[in-house]
Amino acid sequence: MRDVIAGMIIMAVSIPISMGYAQIAGLPAVYGLYGSVFPIILFAVFSTSPQFIFGVDAAPAALIGSALLGMGIEGGSKEALEVVPVLTFFVAVWLLAFYLMHAGKLVNYISAPVMGGFISGICMTIILMQVPKLLGGTAGTGELPELLEHILETAGRINFPSLMLGLISLAILLTVKKVAPKFPMAVVLMAAGAVLTVVLPMEEWGIRTLEAVKPGLPQWKIPDLALLPLNQVITVSLSVAVVIMAETLLAENNFAQKNGYRINDDQELLAFAAGNLVAALTGCCPINGSVSRTAMGEQYQGKTQLMSIVAGASMLILLVCGTGFIGYLPVPVLTCLLYTSDAADEG
C-alpha cells in the first residue's frame, strides 16, 4: 500500500517538474508527461534497483536544449519535435552498446565530486535560464553572457505580479520543506495555482500560464534517422548517454549502499536503454535517473518498483482523462517547482 501511495505522490510531483524539463529540452511541456509513462514503466521492468525512479530530468534536458541551440533549431518548433526523438533514439543505442560492452564497471573510475560539480553547473544554468520566466518573460538561451543579458533585458520590463507570485510560491515551498518535509507541498501549490488562475484575472495582470493540452496519449512512431548528419548525432547522443550512465549509476549505487542492497550495473544500462528507446518512439527527450523522485519515494517508505509502475499508470490515466488543468498552471509557480527540484537533484 505504501508503494502505491508513494507512486501516486511521485506522479503528482512529476507533473510540473517533467513539464519544465521538457521545455528546457526544446519540447512542448506535455512531452514531459509523455516521458513519465512508458519509459519509467519499462525501466522498472528491467531495473535491479528496488527503489530508483526514472524520469525526465535536468542533465539530459539541458544537454539536448543546448544541442538544439547549437544547431540553430528553435525550442518548441516543428523541427525540434522531429530532431529530439532522433537524438533520444541514438542515446538508447549508445546505452545498449554500453550494456553489451559491460561498461557498467567504468562508473567506479568516475570521480563523484567531479560528476557532482558537472551536475551543479547544469542546475545553475537551468536556474539562470528560468529567471526571466519568474520576471514575466521567456526562458533564456545560450551561454552565460547571453543568459545574463536576457535576465537584464527582462528585468527592464519586469511584471511585478509574476515576480510576487513566484517569490511567494518559493518561500512557501522552502518553508514547508523545512518544517514538514513529508508534506507534498508541490502538489498543493500546483493545485492552488490552477485555482488562482480561475478566480483571479491572471491574464490582465500579465501572469503567463501554460498552453492547454488536449487529452490523449503520445503518438508512437519511428524517428526519421536520416534527419541529421551522422557525425552530429553521434557527438550529441554519446555525450548525453555518458552523462546518463555516470550520473544514474553513481546515484543508484549510493542509494543501494545506504539501504543495504546491491544492483547489477550492466543490467541497469539495459534498463536505461529500454526506457530511452520507448521515449524516442513516443517523441520524448532522453530520460535519466531522478535523485529527487527517488528520495521522495524513500521518504514515503516506498520499497519496490511498484512505485514506478503506479506513477506511470497514474500519469497515463491523467493524460487520457484529466489534462484540462494544465492550461491553468501559472508559469511562475511552475518555475519555482523546477528550482526546488534542481536543488534536490544537486544535493
Regions found by a protein language model. Give the residues of each.
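Transmembrane helical cores of multi-pass ion-transport proteins
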Residues: 1-341
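A short, hydrophobic C-terminal helix/tail in secreted or cell-surface proteins
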Residues: 342-347
